[in-house]
Amino acid sequence: MKKWTYILSMVIWITQISPVDAEDKIAIVNISNIFQQSSQRAKIIKQLEYEFKDRATELEKMEHDLQMKIQTLQRDGATMKTIERSELEKSLINQREIFSNKAKEFQQENHSRQTEERDKILNMIQNVVTNVAKKENYDIVIDTNAVLYHSIRVTDITNSVMKQVG
């Protein structure tokens, strides 16, 4: 008897819940679009170019010097003394190795800084999305890249977020 009373009360309770009460308020946002258009991204690109400019110039100079020595070896190698040719070849091998190591280190540090700055911007965008969602009482916010289809009832908050991100 208690079981039937419980079931009956649950059925009555469920039927009294309106469909509006059961619906979640859902929004979508295009994170990649916001990231690509953010003014912070443009500032970071310029900042990183400035930060790595001297090292990039140094690498370009090293590469140019290597190319000049290679041309000298190719052009004059046949007429050089064996000792001179051998010393030039050793010098080239040594300079190539130094250049290769510096270029690899440069690429790794540049990539690391780009990743660090990208993550800062994405975290800031995520915070803005969270604030907009809370302010406008959204239950769920989904990135448009994760959605294959959405109806017109789903609100796109990309512009609201974009305005706050700048």
From Swiss-Prot:
Residues 102-113 are annotated as: Lipopolysaccharide binding. SUPFAM superfamilies: OmpH-like (SSF111384). It comes from the Bacteria. Gene3D superfamilies: Skp domain. Residues 1-22 form the signal peptide. Keywords: Chaperone, Periplasm, Signal. GO terms for molecular function: unfolded protein binding. InterPro entries: Chaperone_Skp, Skp_dom_sf. One of its GO terms (biological process) is chaperone-mediated protein folding. It is found in: Periplasm. One of its GO terms (cellular component) is periplasmic space. Its main location: periplasm. Molecular chaperone that interacts specifically with outer membrane proteins, thus maintaining the solubility of early folding intermediates during passage through the periplasm. Homotrimer. Belongs to the Skp family. This is Chaperone protein Skp.
